[in-house]
Structures are given as structure tokens and as C-alpha cells.
């Protein structure tokens, strides 16, 4: 896997896919890697493999599918299931794919790894049915799972609002939503 490229993009979510496809169209030799097995990131997880039940087409499905199709057709060297674990000042990037390690020498690097959900423990957080919004969104996108209509959403950050909109669009109901993002000094 040791090789060189003009641009290495780390992360195959919407930003990474768009950056890689745009650069490739401009003639740049691009390599894109992501730890997941398929492109799309959290927001378009499993978009190529997903079968959505009739009436459960999420608004951004077609945009996500089009972005992945564009990426697949632009000639980018794609390394799925690969983790970057070290970036040197001279832009050597050390990566692992299963039990194999390698080095990629890049002229430029774009880090487009997206946001990370951080679960905050609270009383009852390990009870059945209690999950993070990221886990609930994965279930909606990969299994078309819609929780019961008496679902409560609580937390902060933009993923909560996105999931609430996707859940309603998919025919789900929300009993209550609590957004807690007060800034404190």
C-alpha cells in the first residue's frame, strides 16, 4: 500500500467525498481513505446498500447517493477500511488496513473526519432502549428502525435536530425533545 499522491483525503463523509471528487476533476492525483467499509460517513451511512421502505425516503437520500456516485466515477484511489494513525510534518501519513501498515506520501492532506459523538453518562443510560442519537440514526439508516411514537430525544448538538427531522420524515413520532446547549463560563 506504500505510495504517493498529490492529495490525501482522510474521511469519506460528505466533505471528504466532495473534496476528493472536486480535486480529481481538476486533474489532481487523489487518494481517499476511511475507516468504514463504504463511503458516506455517518450522514450517508450505507447509502449504496440501503433499501428504504416505501414512504421512508429521507430528504437527503438522493443528494447523498449522487455524491457517492460522483465519487465512485471520478478516478480517486479509494482505501476503505483504513485508519490513519500518524501524520508527520513532511506529510507522510501512516495507515493501517487490518493487520497491514503502510505509509502514504502526500503533497497536501485534507482531514475531513467529521464530528465525534461523546456520550455523557447519566442515571439510567445503560437501560434497554436508551441510546445515543448517533446509534439511533444508524438504526434508522441501516435497518429502517423507527422507534415507538412516545420516544423522548434529549441532548445537544446538530445531530439531535437532524435525527428528529429524519425521524419525523420517516413517519416516526416524538413525545418530547430537550435541547441542552447552554454556554457557561
Question: What role is predicted for each listed range?
Answer:
Residues 13, 26, 82-87, 181:
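Hydrophobic/basic alpha-helical segments enriched in Actinobacteria
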Residues 36-59, 117-129:
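Conserved N-terminal glycine-rich FAD pyrophosphate-binding loop of Rossmann-like flavoproteins
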Residues 4, 10-32, 116-178:
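Rossmann-like dinucleotide/flavin-binding elements
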Residues 178-185:
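Conserved small/polar residues in nucleotide/adenosyl-binding loops
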Residues 1-10, 63-150:
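FAD-binding core/adjacent interface of flavoenzyme oxidoreductases
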Residues 51-69, 159, 181:
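Short beta-strand to alpha-helix junction loop
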Residues 47, 114, 183:
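Flexible loop residues that form catalytic
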Amino acid at each position: 500500500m506504500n505510495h504517493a499522491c498529490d492529495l490525501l483525503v482522510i474521511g469519506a463523509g460528505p466533505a471528504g467525498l466532495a473534496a476528493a471528487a472536486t480535486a480529481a476533476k481538476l486533474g489532481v492525483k487523489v487518494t481517499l481513505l476511511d475507516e468504514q467499509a463504504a463511503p458516506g460517513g455517518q450522514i450517508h451511512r450505507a447509502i449504496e446498500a440501503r433499501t428504504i421502505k416505501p414512504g421512508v425516503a429521507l430528504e437527503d437520500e438522493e443528494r447523498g447517493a449522487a455524491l457517492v456516485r460522483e465519487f465512485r466515477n471520478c478516478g480517486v484511489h479509494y482505501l476503505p477500511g483504513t485508519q490513519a494513525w500518524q501524520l508527520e510534518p513532511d506529510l507522510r501519513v501512516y495507515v493501517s488496513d487490518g493487520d497491514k501498515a503502510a505509509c502514504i506520501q502526500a503533497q497536501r492532506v485534507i482531514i475531513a473526519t467529521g464530528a465525534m459523538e461523546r456520550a455523557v453518562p447519566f442515571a439510567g443510560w445503560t437501560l434497554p432502549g436508551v441510546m445515543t442519537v448517533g446509534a439511533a440514526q444508524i438504526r434508522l439508516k441501516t435497518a429502517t428502525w423507527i422507534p415507538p411514537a412516545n420516544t423522548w430525544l434529549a441532548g445537544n448538538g446538530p445531530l439531535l435536530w437532524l435525527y428528529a427531522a429524519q425521524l419525523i420524515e420517516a413517519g416516526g413520532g416524538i413525545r418530547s425533545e430537550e435541547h441542552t446547549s447552554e454556554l457557561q463560563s
